[in-house]
Design a protein with these regions (language model features):
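N-terminal beta1-alpha1 cap of cysteine-dependent amidohydrolase-like domains
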Residues: 2-8, 13, 24-25, 29, ...
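Short linear segments in intrinsically disordered or otherwise low-structure-confidence regions
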Residues: 16-18
């Protein structure tokens, strides 16, 4: 036992001095060995004890830390009844002056949109589904304005919408021209009366309202842009505010002038020179963009009315996202963003309309009451069209 090795030497019996000396020497060695062993044993035991306590403390400290964190988190969570204010007031209400269920009227065009492959009825008219999807993608619904239905019915439907879209096509005469002219004048009258009633005129729509405003059916010039994608070149000192381009991100605006993101599908247009010389056009519109055709000739491509929410496009913003019949249509992410921003502007303008028609009358006339026809298998033209004939009116 350690107590034996550390006992006093006087308790050990001796016989003679020499033996005592030997015993003393031997005892000294034994004491040194005992002290060394004791020190080693004590050091080892202390080390193991320290390690044992470390292993015991680590999980305890982790557990304690978690409990403290949880307690702190719980102390920062308040029930609505514990707050002095109503938590529902955190969501600001939408602007009451805006209409969050806007409806756009799209005017149908003579024919079936497929050169008679779908319907050769003389009373047939159509709306390409890409225009419908274009409007719906921005948060509005569509009522078809069937151009050859009775006038009173057509204008009753016009009273149900918050904006109008004139589509592309080919017809520039007869009943169709007359209906476009009457609707265009009605749009201006509604705006003059205080309603904010937007119009998008795309391709043929651009051409028709140019003819109507100038009262000149020969105002159009020939261009070679029947199937191509192009850039848009913005005019000098162009002010974005209040135009279709006002919410475009700066990088996308830049790409519009460097990348071919605008689909062209037309043979007619107006040169910048002719536009400037025509006082009717220059007084009504400002030029936002121009383009070059395949022969490097410039034509006006985007117009914005000075005093009305009227925008005219001599290019096709709807095709990038919703038409697949031509390989020249751009489908890049940037091209899709162009389509979306242009659609968003039309619907944002329509939300400002004061017109609040009967909800039931709107439901009775929505394009959901008709079914589109798939015609994309032909590999050209539109992918889908809505066809209207006398039997469906």
């Amino acid at each position: 036992m350690p107590s034996h090795f550390l006992s006093n030497s006087s308790s050990i019996p001796t016989s003679n001095p020499s033996d005592s000396a030997i015993a003393a020497g031997s005892g000294s060695d034994s004491q040194n060995d005992a002290l060394s062993l004791t020190s080693s044993f004590s050091s080892s035991s202390a080390s193991r004890l320290s390690e044992m306590w470390s292993y015991m403390w680590i999980p305890f400290l982790i557990s304690l830390s978690k409990e403290l964190s949880l307690a702190k988190a719980q102390s920062e969570i308040f029930l609505p009844t514990e707050l002095e204010r109503d938590s529902s007031s955190r969501c600001s209400p939408p602007e009451s002056r805006l209409n969050y269920q806007p409806v756009i009227g799209i005017l149908s065009h003579p024919g079936d949109g497929a050169s008679g492959r779908l319907s050769n009825a003389s009373t047939a008219s159509y709306i390409a589904a890409s225009y419908v999807k274009f409007v719906e993608s921005a948060g509005a619904r569509v009522i078809p304005l069937i151009y050859n239905e009775p006038t009173d019915i057509l204008f009753q439907k016009l009273d149900l919408v918050n904006g109008v879209l004139f589509t592309g096509g080919w017809c520039k005469s007869g009943l169709y021209y007359e209906v476009v002219e009457r609707i265009f004048k009605k749009i201006l009258e509604r705006n003059d009366a205080g309603d904010h009633f937007p119009l998008y005129a795309i391709c043929l729509g651009f051409e028709l309202i140019s003819m109507i405003i100038t009262k000149d059916r020969r105002i159009l010039e020939r261009f070679n842009a029947a199937d191509m994608a192009s850039t848009l070149q913005f005019t000098k000192d162009f002010n974005l505010e209040g135009t279709v381009f006002q919410r475009f991100p700066p990088d996308l605006l830049k790409k519009l002038s460097t990348d071919c993101l605008a689909m062209q599908k037309h043979r007619y247009g107006i040169s910048p020179e002719k536009f400037q010389k025509n006082q009717y056009l220059s007084r009504f519109f400002q030029v936002l963009t121009t383009c070059k055709d395949e022969d490097d000739k410039d034509y006006v491509s985007t117009l914005q009315a000075h005093n009305y929410p009227v925008t005219a496009f001599q290019w096709h913003p709807e095709k990038n996202s919703f038409e697949w019949g031509y390989p020249t249509i751009p489908h890049t992410e940037d091209a899709i963003q162009v389509t979306q921003h242009v659609a968003n502007f039309l619907v944002s303008e329509a939300r400002k309309s004061l017109n609040r028609p009967s909800p039931q009358k709107v439901l009775d006339n929505l394009i959901y009451n008709y079914s589109p026809t798939y015609c994309g298998k032909a590999g050209r033209g539109y992918d889908e069209v809505y066809i209207f004939t006398r039997s469906s009116l």
